Design a protein with these regions (language model features):
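C-terminal cap of thioredoxin/glutaredoxin-like
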Residues: 1-13, 70-134
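Structural alpha/beta surface segment adjacent to cysteine/selenocysteine redox centers
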Residues: 3-73
Length: 134
């Protein structure tokens, strides 16, 4: 559902000044989601975290290694630096902090959406989100 809601959130944020979208890396599925989360965090050292996140979540179908390599290229990342930054202690600490924060506010699954005082632990349509913003 994260891939399904991603373009809707980006569209809302681009259309409305009163909407702010914040992505926390909160891997819960498997080692692959953990590695991809580390990769997105490491991309921030090159100021390309959002670009990589967007490229990954904009890809169609299952994320293959080929699609991931293409997302890295499309994001304009230096891949060698990205691999080094993924192994930094800081990257690991940021990932653990992000998961800690997500868990601390009740996010047990993904996507988790907070709209003012409302919390949804799952997918919401764009229309549902707009109704909650009123």
């Amino acid at each position: 559902y994260c891939k399904k809601i991603h373009p809707e959130l980006i569209e809302l944020a681009n259309q409305r000044d009163d909407v702010r979208v914040i992505f926390l890396q909160h891997p819960i599925l498997n080692e692959t989601s953990f590695a991809i989360s580390k990769m997105v965090i490491a991309a921030n050292y090159q100021n390309k975290g959002f670009e990589l996140h967007n490229a990954i979540f904009s890809s169609q179908g299952a994320l293959t290694s080929e699609k991931l390599e293409q997302a890295i290229k499309d994001s304009g990342l230096n891949e060698a630096k990205l691999r080094i930054d993924m192994s930094r202690d800081e990257t690991e600490k940021i990932l653990h902090l992000s998961s800690f924060l997500a868990g601390g506010v009740g996010a047990r699954g993904t996507p988790s959406i907070f709209i003012n005082e409302y919390f949804s632990g799952g997918y919401l349509s764009k229309e549902q989100i707009i109704n909650l913003l009123k």
